[in-house]
Amino acid sequence: MSPPGPLSIRRGRLDLHLHSNRSDGRHEPRFVLQTCAAAGVTLAALTDHDLPPALDGGAYTFGERSIIHLEAAEVSGAWAGRELHLLVYFPSKMPEDYRELLRGRARFRARRWDAFRAAAGLEARLPPAPEEALAGRLALTRHHLARALLDAEVVSRWQEAFDGPLNPASGLLLPLDLSFPEAIAGARAAGAVCSWAHPELDDARAWAGTFAGMGLQGLESGRPGIGRLMREELGRVAHKHRLFLTGGTDWHGWSGERPSFSFPMREGHAFVSALGLPTGP
């Protein structure tokens, strides 16, 4: 892998939603980026949950393939009793104060892990949050908790963990202490461009206008598994509220190879323009 070079975007395909093993993904950050490059993606963003990026932004070369990486994150925020996710992108280096904000969010996740162990009476069966998480360098998610519950034989099936102890209705998980509007405001104040990750259509119709008024700039409409009609409807919601569109695989690596889906540059021009990056001829 060659070291990062300057950003320059012309044409190609985008994957703006990816995860590594620094949050709930399976693979190392460099492997994720290399996999995207091998698939012909030309602009990618590792968006680990509530963490600063592991790789610098810029242009990378893997063999004969080149790819541009954006410094980014996926930030969780509470709204109307729900957990929503905000994709936060930077055109250059993520500011240090925002990196520290994200490390604080990762430390909250570590505290939530230990609080869950205590609330569920599982302190003898589940390990404490690792030092890396307590230091804000690893984001512990419900995926990690579900795996720990399976390994400890507290549950016998993956879905049982999410339907039972990890269901927010169980009251065993600490509620988020950051609201979605606060997540938007913090990202914008740091100079980021932000997009609402994987919104449900009804939620987008109900709340996109409200969030746009708070500073939201984009809506994730392109992702594997959604049909053309839903994608078009999300596009209409975005157009109504003057939001650009983003897209990505949300690939974690656990189900095998990265999906062949990628977001075409012709749909991502408004996003790239919002970042202030040159697109060339």
Which residue ranges define each predicted feature?
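N-terminal amphipathic alpha-helix/helix-capping segment at the start of soluble metabolic enzymes
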Residues: 1-11, 185
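A metal-dependent hydrolase metal-coordination microenvironment
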Residues: 8-140, 214, 219-257, 264-265
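Catalytic beta/alpha-barrel core
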Residues: 46-49, 170-177, 195-200, 220-225
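Active-site gating loops and adjacent loop-to-helix segments of metal-dependent hydrolytic enzymes
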Residues: 78-110, 147-169, 262-281
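Conserved, well-ordered alpha-helix/loop/beta-strand core segments that scaffold catalytic motifs
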Residues: 173-200, 206-214
